[in-house]
């Protein structure tokens, strides 16, 4: 059986990981408790959006940390964006990406999610779901 745990939030600065510590207005802890009995993270579902307010080319990465990770901190790319020109009326939908992983974890311990972009391309929001088994 798979368990899905999500956190979301604003990515507030370039070249600095920002913790994802919200759940769409619901009361929750900042970190994710690994479901009891789970031994690994088997999937990542991630999406990111920006307002494209600043021209630039950015790569975006996610970082997992905490005592719920058997092998320590993990960092992986979740997207990229290029902005050239004005963002007037350029609304678009970004579908989430999925990534199959095999990250060992410790049941009932904690995992924190954070996201960073290497270049400021405007205000950014990210959401990441971890799939535990």
Predicted feature residues:
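Positively charged, low-complexity intrinsically disordered regions
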Residues: 6-8, 27, 41, 64, ...
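Solvent-exposed, conformationally flexible loop/turn segments
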Residues: 11-27, 37, 80-94, 106-108
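Exposed aromatic-hydrophobic patches
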Residues: 29-31, 93-102
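Noncatalytic modules at the cell exterior or secretory-pathway interfaces
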Residues: 42-43, 102-120
């Amino acid at each position: 059986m798979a368990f899905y745990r999500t956190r979301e939030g604003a990515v507030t600065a370039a070249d600095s990981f920002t913790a994802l510590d919200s759940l769409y207005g619901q009361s929750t802890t900042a970190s994710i408790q690994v479901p009891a009995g789970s031994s690994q993270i088997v999937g990542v579902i991630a999406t990111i959006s920006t307002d494209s307010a600043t021209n630039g080319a950015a790569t975006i990465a996610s970082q997992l940390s905490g005592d719920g990770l058997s092998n320590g901190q993990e960092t992986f790319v979740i997207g990229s964006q290029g902005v050239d020109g004005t963002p007037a009326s350029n609304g678009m939908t970004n579908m989430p990406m999925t990534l199959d992983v095999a990250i060992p974890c410790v049941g009932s311990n904690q995992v924190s999610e954070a996201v960073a972009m290497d270049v400021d391309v405007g205000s950014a929001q990210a959401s990441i779901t971890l799939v535990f088994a």
